[in-house]
A protein has these predicted regions:
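Metal-dependent phosphoester/phosphodiester hydrolase catalytic core
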Residues: 1-461
């Protein structure tokens, strides 16, 4: 999927613009393999998408757009591989708050030459007002509009503002992207019929949700569909199942409301998406695909009571029946080699996924684990343990969670996945800072899941 946005000339904001596109197999576009014209229209905020057909699988292509006498920079993309591919490399990102710092993680991902795709797990933008009290900002990082995003024009302006960032645009110009939303593309802690602390003057939630979804569809290079959840096949090596944990979920409840919290009907994904997920897992397993990767938003792993009580019920801990149904499917249908990929919590985690970390799970051997979870840190958003005593709290959190194989609650960055038929390698990269634009980063941890093991161990052991 090729994407660009045309900036209308002054006074021409209502006139459609003819756009020519070309795609070829060399960076000078001397060998054009497909081309055509499309129209950028004001009702789509002058964004343009091209679903280029007839391309070879597993191949790198280069593309450009021409409009109104101007040519875009040449972009690079890659097609999904054919069956029989032996290696897959993915970058995983989430939580990129423009105000909180520079997108150094995006900069470093854009510089990589060895990626098949980038997975965005949500919070691509933040809807907050720039005047929200108590929020620390990096000088010069002020998105538009200044007020909280509520209308379609607001959300469009926020995406347009964020796309002025050179590191974000470099990433999109270099790698194909697979994206799903979380809450901040609409409103904090959103659920099926609302969100946290909505104001009456902001209008009905349905209209705001529809506006947020339209802007997301316009500004992201994805094939549009009424449903956001979808499946990507990487040549029989991995199936990536991108889930929508916001549009269909039941409302969050207080931890003290035990009856509501433990209701067997409680759902994170909604009945239709849940059935689709289980069907996709079964068909992937039957097809002999090596790995099943679930791209989703909030922490999936269960936690021991004294630790879990400190977490928000916005995650799967607040939907225990839905999590149990997932475990039932994996166990009943013998679904193997599942990795849950998570964002949202602004920290780096690697976990085994047993039904309970305190019963039927062996920390030493991994027996009882049914899958693994890999959580990517924030690109810029404030770290999970960002205040005084962060390291001590992280150690306490870690020691109370026997299924936790790695955690860093202080640093920003991204995760790299290197996948073969024999193993899945997860590497956490942390940037030195987000308060200045720099490429400085370090590899913080490497965990591996051997096929058939459903557990994470340190790479090289």
């Amino acid at each position: 999927m090729l994407w660009t946005r045309i900036t209308p000339a002054a006074g021409g904001a209502s006139a459609p613009v003819q756009v020519r596109w070309r795609i070829g197999d060399d960076d000078r576009l001397t060998r054009v393999v497909a081309q055509g014209t499309v129209v950028a229209r004001p009702e789509r905020d002058f964004t343009v998408k091209v679903d280029a057909a007839g391309l070879r699988p597993g191949a790198t292509y280069y593309y450009t757009f021409d409009a109104a006498g101007e040519q875009s920079p040449v972009g690079r993309t890659r097609t999904l591989p054919a069956r029989g591919t032996s290696r897959l490399r993915l970058a995983v990102v989430s939580c990129a708050d423009f105000e909180k710092g520079y997108f150094n993680a995006y900069r470093n991902i854009a510089a990589r030459q060895d990626l098949d795709a980038v997975l965005f797990l949500g919070d691509y933008i933040y809807e907050y007002a720039t005047t929200t009290p108590g929020i620390e900002r990096v000088a010069g990082r002020v998105p538009a509009p200044a007020h909280e995003c509520v209308t379609l024009d607001d959300y469009r302006m926020r995406y347009a503002s964020q796309h002025l960032d050179p590191d974000l645009t470099a990433l999109h110009a270099t790698h194909p992207c697979i994206a799903v939303w979380d809450d901040h593309e609409s409103a904090n802690d959103s659920w099926r019929d609302g969100a946290l602390r909505l104001e009456a003057e902001q209008g009905p939630w349905a209209a705001r949700k529809a506006a947020a979804r339209q802007a997301f569809d316009e500004w992201l290079p994805l094939r549009e569909s009424p449903r956001m959840y979808r499946r990507f096949g990487f040549g029989g090596l991995a199936d990536v199942l991108m889930l929508d944990g916001r549009s269909y979920r039941d409302q969050q409840v207080l931890p003290s409301d035990y009856v509501a919290l433990t209701s067997p009907r409680r759902s994170m994904l909604g009945a239709e998406q849940e059935a689709w997920l289980y069907g996709a897992l079964r068909s992937s397993q039957r097809a002999g695909t090596a790995w099943r990767l679930l791209g989703q938003q909030v922490i999936f792993a269960p936690f021991v009571p004294q630790v879990g009580s400190a977490l928000e019920v916005d995650n799967w801990e607040g939907y225990p029946a839905a999590r149990t149904r997932f475990f039932d499917c994996v166990e009943r249908d013998r679904i193997a080699d599942v990795a849950v990929l998570t964002g949202d919590i602004h920290s780096s985690w690697g976990l085994d996924l047993p039904r309970s970390p305190l019963s039927g799970y062996d920390q030493t051997t991994g027996r009882g684990s049914l899958a693994v979870e890999i959580i990517t840190p924030a690109v810029t958003s404030p770290p999970f343990f960002s205040r005084a005593g962060a390291r001590d709290r992280a150690k306490q959190f870690h020691s109370a969670s026997p299924h936790m194989r790695y955690m860093d609650g202080e640093r920003r960055g991204y995760v790299m996945l290197d996948i073969t038929r024999e193993r899945l390698l997860a590497e956490w990269y942390h940037v030195r800072t987000v308060t200045e634009r720099t490429a400085d980063e370090s590899k913080a941890a490497s965990l591996v899941c051997e096929r058939g093991s459903a557990r994470l161990v340190e790479a090289g052991l």
